[in-house]
């Protein structure tokens, strides 16, 4: 967001909490790309199999922090230490498919600029029994951590919403240990994301507010070359990027656009009339209807995963 203040996202925290559990399976699928890019097993070997410290930025109410915590969960009966914030939660969930990366264990410090998001994250971690995670409110442009505190810094769909994304990149570089890795998942351009294009057009037509009017710029890291240059300027080396375009298969009667729409525009939609809400849903359905095949929506999303090291 071009205005990365706690108040901006505080008004959306209830929407994020509302959808979190229902979106968890889909989140887990795309989070795997970040875990692979972090190359936890190789990093753990470089650290002599010592527990890794992971910092997740803009964690919202849990992802991808939960996925990283499961990937680094200690086998049953063992514990890991590291990282350092408050609000640790319950026993590890070793049944998740991403748990127990070979030769790697560790601790995740989840963070978000909105305290209410952090509270929701801590509650969900306790409910799911994730032990190797802690949570702390933090502004990624001014992190409350010492230099060289973490082995991995991760951020999914967050850095583009900062007031100063380049300062956020520099802060991530600062808190990484030498040889550590930063991994960012960012949206590709809107033209490659038909759901967002439909959302922007329909909300603009009916409510007079789209991404620009809301001060949102989800696509500012959409140009891979420019984004890699920004990471290099921040001090990172060994920068790589991959692009992913998955498409789900969702029954056409399911208004699958509501989670993303609520989590970005929930504060506006709550004031919309029932007539406007109905018109919005009808217009988005019509706009995305070319993606219906055999009674199912198959709408692609497109994102990049940027990965880099601190020398």
Model region roles, listed by residue range:
Residues 3-9, 27, 217-311:
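Conserved Class I S-adenosyl-L-methionine
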Residues 166-167, 173, 177, 181-251, ...:
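Conserved catalytic/acceptor-binding region of the Class I
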Residues 1-49, 63-67, 71, 120, ...:
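Conserved class I S-adenosyl-L-methionine
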Residues 72, 124-125, 203, 288, ...:
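Conserved hydrophobic residues forming the short capping helix/wall of the S-adenosyl-L-methionine
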Residues 53-143:
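Class I SAM-dependent methyltransferase SAM/SAH-binding core
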Residues 151-165, 188:
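A short SAM/SAH-binding and catalytic strip from SAM-dependent methyltransferases
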Residues 141-152:
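A short acidic, Gly/Pro-enriched loop at the edge of an enzyme's catalytic core
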């Amino acid at each position: 967001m071009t205005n990365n203040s706690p108040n901006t996202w505080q008004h959306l925290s209830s929407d994020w909490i509302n959808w979190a559990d229902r979106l968890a399976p889909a989140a887990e699928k795309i989070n795997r790309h970040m875990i692979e890019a972090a190359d936890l097993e190789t990093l753990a070997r470089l650290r002599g199999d010592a527990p890794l410290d992971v910092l997740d930025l803009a964690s919202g109410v849990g992802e991808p922090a939960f996925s990283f915590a499961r990937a680094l969960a200690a086998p049953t009966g063992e514990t890991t230490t590291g990282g350092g914030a408050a609000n640790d939660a319950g026993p590890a969930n070793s049944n998740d498919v991403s748990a127990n990366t070979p030769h790697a264990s560790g601790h995740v410090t989840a963070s978000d600029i909105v305290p209410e998001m952090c509270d929701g994250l801590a509650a969900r971690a306790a409910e799911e029994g994730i032990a190797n995670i802690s949570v702390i409110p933090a502004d990624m442009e001014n992190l409350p951590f010492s230099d060289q505190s973490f082995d991995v810094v991760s951020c999914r769909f967050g850095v583009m919403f900062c007031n100063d994304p380049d300062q956020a990149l520099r802060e991530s570089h600062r808190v990484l240990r030498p040889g550590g890795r930063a991994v960012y998942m960012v949206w590709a351009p809107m033209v490659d994301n038909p759901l967002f294009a439909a959302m922007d057009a329909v909300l603009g037509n009916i409510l007079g507010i789209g991404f620009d009017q809301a001060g949102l710029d989800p696509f500012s890291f959409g140009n891979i070359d420019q984004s890699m240059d920004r990471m290099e300027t921040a001090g990172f080396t060994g920068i790589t990027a991959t692009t992913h375009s998955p498409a789900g298969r969702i029954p056409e009667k399911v208004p699958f656009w509501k989670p993303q729409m609520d989590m970005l525009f929930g504060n506006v939609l709550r004031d919309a009339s029932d007539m406007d809400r109905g018109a919005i849903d009808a217009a988005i359905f019509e706009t995305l209807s070319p993606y219906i095949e055999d009674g199912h929506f198959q709408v692609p999303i497109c994102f990049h995963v940027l990965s880099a090291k601190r020398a």
